[in-house]
Amino acid sequence: IVPFLLGMVPKLVCLITKKC
């Protein structure tokens, strides 16, 4: 898996769940 994608996943989860 590309490191860039690994970095994007937590950000997407943060935006969706509003838990940062």
Swiss-Prot record:
Gene Ontology biological-process entries: defense response to bacterium; defense response to fungus; killing of cells of another organism
Keywords of the record: Amphibian defense peptide, Antibiotic, Antimicrobial, Cytolysis, Disulfide bond, Fungicide, Hemolysis, Oxidation, Secreted
Main location as per UniProt: secreted
Localization, UniProt: Secreted
Methionine sulfoxide sites (modified residues): M8
The keyword Disulfide bond appears for this protein: yes
Top-level taxon of origin: Eukaryota
Tissues showing expression: Expressed by the skin glands.
InterPro entries cross-referenced by the UniProt entry: Antimicrobial_frog_1
Disulfide bonds: C14-C20
GO CC list: extracellular region
Record-stated family: Belongs to the frog skin active peptide (FSAP) family. Brevinin subfamily.
Function as written in the Swiss-Prot or TrEMBL entry: Antimicrobial peptide active against Gram-positive bacterium S.epidermidis ATCC 12228 (MIC=4 uM), against Gram-negative bacterium E.coli ATCC 25922 (MIC=64 uM) and against yeast C.parapsilosis ATCC 22019 (MIC=16 uM). Has hemolytic and cytotoxic activity.
The protein's name in its UniProt record: Brevinin-1ITa
Organism: Rana italica
